[in-house]
Amino acid sequence: MKRLLIVLIALLAMLEYRLWFGDKSLAESFHLQEQIKLQQQSNAQLVARNQILREEISDLRSGTEALEERARNELGMVKEGETFFRVVGGERDKPSND
């Protein structure tokens, strides 16, 4: 009976060790769950970014307005007959917090 008790205690100690410190332990499980949450957040951001890019591609394919806007903003191009004005100066007037 004494040997059986010793064997059972040793088995319990071995199982507890594996639970807390071994492969697939609770600590590793919590760490993996945290990594999954971070990856899901990253995936959600990338899905939103992809949707924006898809919409932009669709706009560029379907009409000239988006293409013209992009040419104006990124390349500084102007239409024939338009006058380009560049405002040079410091920061815009900001309301004071007083």
Swiss-Prot record:
Keywords, in A-Z order: Cell cycle, Cell division, Cell inner membrane, Cell membrane, Coiled coil, Membrane, Transmembrane, Transmembrane helix
Record GO cellular component, one term: plasma membrane
UniProt xrefs under Pfam families: DivIC (PF04977)
Membrane-spanning ranges: 4-21
Chief place of localization: membrane
BP-aspect Gene Ontology terms: FtsZ-dependent cytokinesis
Disulfide feature: none
Cytoplasmic-side segments: 1-3
Coiled coil: 31-74
Annotated membrane topology: Single-pass type II membrane protein
Positions in the Periplasmic compartment: 22-98
Localization in the cell: Cell inner membrane
Domain of life: Bacteria
Family, similarity comment: Belongs to the FtsB family.
Known role: Essential cell division protein. May link together the upstream cell division proteins, which are predominantly cytoplasmic, with the downstream cell division proteins, which are predominantly periplasmic.
Quaternary structure and interacting proteins, as annotated: Part of a complex composed of FtsB, FtsL and FtsQ.
Protein name: Cell division protein FtsB
Gene: ftsB
